[in-house]
Amino acid sequence: MLIKLLTKVFGSRNDRTLRRMRKVVNIINAMEPEMEKLSDEELKGKTAEFRVRLEKGEVLENLIPEAFAVVREASKRVFGMRHFDVQLLGGMVLNERCIAEMRTGEGKTLTATLPAYLNALTGKGVHVVTVNDYLAQRDAENNRPLFEFLGLTVGINLPGMPAPAKREAYAADITYGTNNEYGFDYLRDNMAFSPEERVQRKLHYALVDEVDSILIDEARTPLIISGPAEDSSEMYKRVNKIIPHLIRQEKEDSETFQGEGHFSVDEKSRQVNLTERGLVLIEELLVKEGIMDEGESLYSPANIMLMHHVTAALRAHALFTRDVDYIVKDGEVIIVDEHTGRTMQGRRWSDGLHQAVEAKEGVQIQNENQTLASITFQNYFRLYEKLAGMTGTADTEAFEFSSIYKLDTVVVPTNRPMIRKDLPDLVYMTEAEKIQAIIEDIKERTAKGQPVLVGTISIEKSELVSNELTKAGIKHNVLNAKFHANEAAIVAQAGYPAAVTIATNMAGRGTDIVLGGSWQAEVAALENPTAEQIEKIKADWQVRHDAVLAAGGLHIIGTERHESRRIDNQLRGRSGRQGDAGSSRFYLSMEDALMRIFASDRVSGMMRKLGMKPGEAIEHPWVTKAIANAQRKVESRNFDIRKQLLEYDDVANDQRRAIYSQRNELLDVSDVSETINSIREDVFKATIDAYIPPQSLEEMWDIPGLQERLKNDFDLDLPIAEWLDKEPELHEETLRERILAQSIEVYQRKEEVVGAEMMRHFEKGVMLQTLDSLWKEHLAAMDYLRQGIHLRGYAQKDPKQEYKRESFSMFAAMLESLKYEVISTLSKVQVRMPEEVEELEQQRRMEAERLAQMQQLSHQDDDSAAAAALAAQTGERKVGRNDPCPCGSGKKYKQCHGRLQ
């Protein structure tokens, strides 16, 4: 009550922010007459003037009024478009490390030119981030004339571009590209073998378009660069034959062992669990197929990989549906983005799931991959010094933006009042009744010339509605992953009188739906149009535009509620742009996924009490409230998952930053000999300590073991036993110094043969290659640890704390292994001539190039551990202190490599 009263008196935080910014807008407006008087050359010269002022120490924020006034005036001259006051407000919000919520059609692309210009003045680069390549290219080309008029350079960063072109794009003042490409370039730069191979500059300012889609919807899916792992495609095929024999059971009853089902599905968490009966049948079938020996258990340690195959195959059959989660095109399984409905060419599910789906669909199974580098969008975008974003729907996720990214959300008012009518939801008992009602509504709307946009949540649903419309004889366009190339053209004409467009989720975001259709698209279709033709097209469009407005504007039909209210609002937001008329309505059924999983019992009870008949719809505040509560429940659960993922990924992120920082230092120096000398001392001290414990009696020394270790691991054939026989007075410390001196002497002799410069080059290459190899193995082990860490909860331990503790131990052990392997490799390498060192270096380069060609870029679902299979194959089991050391010395681990821990 008190908060409401205070808000009424002083205004909300949003109101206070806008009030403060409106004062600056008044200053910008007052500068307009002065700017209009400037010649083109004088206006262009302002950029150089601003840069000089910044160099002299002026603060960027002080330039806002004048810089924004310059951009507005330049836009009037170049585009004939003047920034509205609300766009100036949006520009200021974006400069203040905030999220600007601006409704569809309010000109977000033009708004972005203001903060992009201002922050580009620093010379550190601005990254404008879009959701797909088409929008990146379109926005860059559209805004290029404005920025170039003002003396700034513009770059486009697209997938598949050669490194020199990418480097040029990043060197530009303002770079346009997709979130995926920026992230992958960051990972690739941190796998480079020379500073010249890197393409990015320091990450300065990121301006993210459709920020909710990138920072929230895609936050759970890390970017992964992977290389090929061991081939196990045959096993996927063999296990796939077994799965159709299993029957789904709604609930597992392991105690009474009743029911015919073999597995249960938890749709909320998207997990599949074998029942007791299912486990027995699976084991019988595996024995029958000759995959497993009789009497063996599927859960025995020896069958851990087999269990992985069974789980992947079960998930592929029970949870993943063709034309919903993926499509099959040209003999390839292509993932469909659940948020946008677009296909994600080249991306693959992790943990063997993609191979299992390929086996299910009978297409060629591609090899599993091993993670080489990985980062989540949450952690990538937090690397920027300054981050801001814009979207039409951010307010519902304001808490998440604030708690995870430290970004406040500011709702920017519309230029004209919003008059769209959002009609109450209609709920039917069955999907068939719902679809029929949608068809009737479309018939009524199109009969009076009103355009209709139908939003569906999957390709399967869009094709179902399309088939029904075809049966009813209604002409329509389908916009889903299968018709990707025509996306922008179809969306542009969706406002044509009586046009019916079916869009999967929010395919086509970023392209405005103009009432009456797009006259620009009609002009673009003509070859060398005359002024008369253009005028006629414009006049025809005006007639159509007025007719659509009279019919009620664009009508939006939602065929289902999405898990998130924000996605529903995005669909509604396609109508009612810039004060246009419009309407929207959602049609639901008790068979919809959201209703079935989260709201079914309560709402079904209400509907029965209200005595519903077939074909009847319910329209009641109770039902709407129950649906909103179901959505809040899902949103809250998804937020918790993302927050938990971030807490776990932060552990890996600290390690990633340490490794990448060390790697970049290595790349930037030409001489690492001091580092090599320092770690050689550490390695030899630790190695000698394992056989000659400090301050110990001579009887405790293991001289034969030490000699063997030095010979095997460092190619040092030293007669230590002879030294001790000839010099009984040889002290432990003197012996250590002599061994180290001998190793340095042998190494220096190699250096004399090949030359100091060549040796420095080789040392650097060995350090980089060893670091990359161990980091790759560490990532696999971390994924494997993450997969099973939740089980620690059963031992009354906090899984997060256990994960932090164990991953730190693994990281420390990896750094020790790095030292040991670098010195071992450098000691063992045999070189006689400079040409041989050059040849070794050439081999290393060729191997790096081969791996680069085999790398796959994937944006993978983090619900499964990305490299569990690999870790099971390559991750070493934990060695007990009293176990024999894995190095083969024959000593106990605690007296050998255990001392390095």
Swiss-Prot record:
Zn(2+) binds at C885, C887, C896, H897. Its main location: membrane. Residues 891-901 have a biased composition (Basic residues). May bind 1 zinc ion per subunit. It is found in: Cell inner membrane; Cytoplasm. It catalyses: ATP + H2O + cellular proteinSide 1 = ADP + phosphate + cellular proteinSide 2. GO terms for biological process: intracellular protein transmembrane transport; protein import; protein targeting; protein transport by the Sec complex. CDD domains: DEXDc_SecA (cd17928), SF2_C_secA (cd18803). The keyword Aminoacyl-tRNA synthetase does not apply. Monomer and homodimer. Part of the essential Sec protein translocation apparatus which comprises SecA, SecYEG and auxiliary proteins SecDF-YajC and YidC. Belongs to the SecA family. This is Protein translocase subunit SecA.
